[in-house]
Structures are given as structure tokens and as C-alpha cells.
Amino acid sequence: MTRTAKLTIIPPGRPLSGRAMPPGSKSITNRALLLAGLAKGTSRMTGALKSDDTRYMADALRAMGVAIDEPDDTTFVVTGSGRLMPPKAPLFLGNAGTATRFLTAAAALVDGTVVVDGDEHMRKRPIGPLVEAMRTLGIDVSADTGCPPVTVRGTGRFEADRILIDGGLSSQYVSALLMMAAGGDRPVDIELVGEDIGALGYIDLTTAAMKAFGARVEKTSPVTWRVEPTGYRAADFVIEPDASAATYLWAAEVLSDGQIDLGVPNDAFTQPDAKAYETIAKFPHLPAEIDGSQMQDAVPTIAVLAAFNETPVRFVGIANLRVKECDRIRALSTGLNNIREGLAVEEGDDLIVHSDPALAGQTLPAEIDTFADHRIAMSFALAGLKIDGITILDPDCVGKTFPAYWRTLAALGVTYQGKD
């Protein structure tokens, strides 16, 4: 399939209205796929996301002996034997951070060698803290650059009473170890060390999914979890819509003064990015300072929205955005300054947006480099709702988590140049 080189958004000039259901949660889908793959028996996952990231996870599990059927666009039927098998070739996971981190840890439960690799972007994303934690368990694991590829020479088991992990860079390291730990031989305490972890809510998603698949896990302190060696059992599992995807629709609604029905109440989400709704709803009077540490994937959405706010906005607690699919702080400042020089400034790991509501209605031709990052593409599309001339480069990168994004906006009344 030929990729679209660029897409120019035509400001609709009217409120956006209609029903727009976000896809299933990427974070929950990839957790559930792995847990179902580790379980013995057949699990049925409904409401699931079918996207680049979840396809990478599903294909990797297939390569490790798990049978996965897809009877429709939102369902996975997963049949596992209770044990993952060594794949015949390296696992290629594109730029899927969840799949890469989760499968690196799960590879310790494989009796054989597993190589976890990704594309040129994934090969720049750090995985050292997870590798170091696994080594302390006696697991033979190597990552020469501190980034993928990672080679795990597993024995199918590990023994540990306690695992220390620095989750300062990513909560995914912690989630990976938690899911691995239920396959151990004895109870394990997993304890955070180092810098305060961001996005603790994603660990709550992990433990909730683990419990749904039969694991026993308990939070014994603010930084410690105890996991029993239960393994996993097959389960039917319903996946809620993606809160990160919902943020674009919430922002489109307030920017256009429209009315968009997401098909699910705003308070029904359990994902961390759902916290963004209360912030977005305050537009055009966003707070002067926004802490993005607990809603990291929503920061690009709110940063572009902030360009049209009544007063400037400083984003703090977002250092982790530098090691996402791209350096999102740099990508946001670059894109905003392409729209108008001086619109954004980086101060250390903070981002300051010098808001100007007068931007709305102007013609400001700007090509937005997405750096192949789905969230940069989807966020800057919002600017195109109010400014004439916004062109998104590599718009198909949204396929990572929201393949129907452009069609969804079109159904609400947005038109484009450069895409059918």
C-alpha cells in the first residue's frame, strides 16, 4: 500500500458534530494479548485495537507458538499452551514500545533464545533499566547499546524474591516485570528505586489486567508490589476505548465549539490519559502550568490546544516525552514554531506555549514534520481546524494506534487536500 506523503487540513469553519467512537485501548490490548498468550486455554478479547502496535504484538506471539484468530475488526481469540516457545527468527516490533518492553521480560519465561528488535526509531529508545533488572535475577540478557536489539537466553524459569527497578524513564519497565513475575517459582516483591516514576496509572492498568487473567498481585506500599507465582488462566476480556485517542476528539470539540459523542461517558475510562478531559474542558482558560507526568500521551494534544488559549501555558513533568516514539518536546516546539516563530520555547525539559487566540482564522502555511510519530500527527491536525495551511507530513503514521483517525475527523466534517 502506497503511503500518503502529506495531507493539508481545510479548516471546517463550523462546529464539528456527530458520533466518533475511539478505537480500543492500545495499552490494554497489548497487555491482554501477552497475558492471554501466557495463559493455558482460549481467551476472547473484544473491543480490541487493531493497529500497527497490536499487530506487532500479535505476530510476535504467533511466532512464539500462540494461536491467534481475528474473527472481526475488534476481536482477538487467543489460545495459549501456558508456555511461550522460542521463535525461529528475531521478533521485529517496529516502534512499538509496549510490545518491545513487555516481550523482553516475558522472554525470560522461554526455554531458549529470543531476540527482540525494532525499527530505527525503536533502536534509539532506552531499555537499559529493564535489562539491568533482569540481569540481577540471573537471566542471561544483553543489549549492547542500551536500546534494542535485546537478546534473552532464557531457561523457561527464574528464581527471585525481590526485583528492584528504576522506572524513572518508563513505567513500561515495571509493567513488564510485573507480568513476568507471575510466571516465576516463588512470590516476588517488585520495588521501585531511583527517580519518581511517572504515569503510575499505567501500572494500575497492568495489575488490573493481570488479575483478570487469574494472577494474584497486591500493592504493599506506594512503591512495592507482591506477585504470587500463579501463572495465568484464559479469560474473556472486554477492552475499553482508548483514552489517549479520545483526547483528540475532546480537543476538536472545544476548539470548534462543537458537540462530539464518543459513545462512552468521560468518567468511564480507567486509563491515565482520561485525566486530560478536565484540563481540556477548561479551554480557552487552561491553567498556567500543567503537570503532564500522569497523562503523558495527552500532552501533545493539550500543547497544540494551548496555542489558541487566552494565556501562556507551561508544561512540566514531561521529561519522559524525550524518549517516546520521538523527542516529543522537540517535535512539539518545532511544529509550533513552524506555525509561527516564538510560539513555543523549551526550557530544560519544560515546554512553554506562548498562546495567542488570534491565530484562529489566519492563513499560516506550515509543514509539520511528524518524525513518524502518530501523536504528533494527530495533535497538529487540531491546529488545522483553526488555521489555514497546516500540512501534516507522513500522515499515515497514525496507523500505529488510530488507523481510522483521518476518516473519523472527515465524518465529523473535516476535509483535506492530498488524501482520498
Curated annotation (Swiss-Prot):
GO terms for molecular function: 3-phosphoshikimate 1-carboxyvinyltransferase activity. Signal peptide: none annotated. Residues 1-24 are annotated as: Disordered. Its EC number is 2.5.1.19. Pathway: Metabolic intermediate biosynthesis; chorismate biosynthesis; chorismate from D-erythrose 4-phosphate and phosphoenolpyruvate: step 6/7. Coiled coil: none annotated. Phosphoenolpyruvate binds at K26, G97, R125, Q172, R328, R375, K400. InterPro entries: Enolpyruvate_Tfrase_dom (IPR001986), Enolpyruvate_Tfrase_sf (IPR036968), EPSP_synthase (IPR006264), EPSP_synthase_CS (IPR023193), RNA3'P_cycl/enolpyr_Trfase_a/b (IPR013792). It catalyses: 3-phosphoshikimate + phosphoenolpyruvate = 5-O-(1-carboxyvinyl)-3-phosphoshikimate + phosphate. Pfam families: EPSP_synthase. Keywords: Amino-acid biosynthesis, Aromatic amino acid biosynthesis, Cytoplasm, Transferase. Catalyzes the transfer of the enolpyruvyl moiety of phosphoenolpyruvate (PEP) to the 5-hydroxyl of shikimate-3-phosphate (S3P) to produce enolpyruvyl shikimate-3-phosphate and inorganic phosphate. NCBIfam families: aroA. Belongs to the EPSP synthase family. This is 3-phosphoshikimate 1-carboxyvinyltransferase.
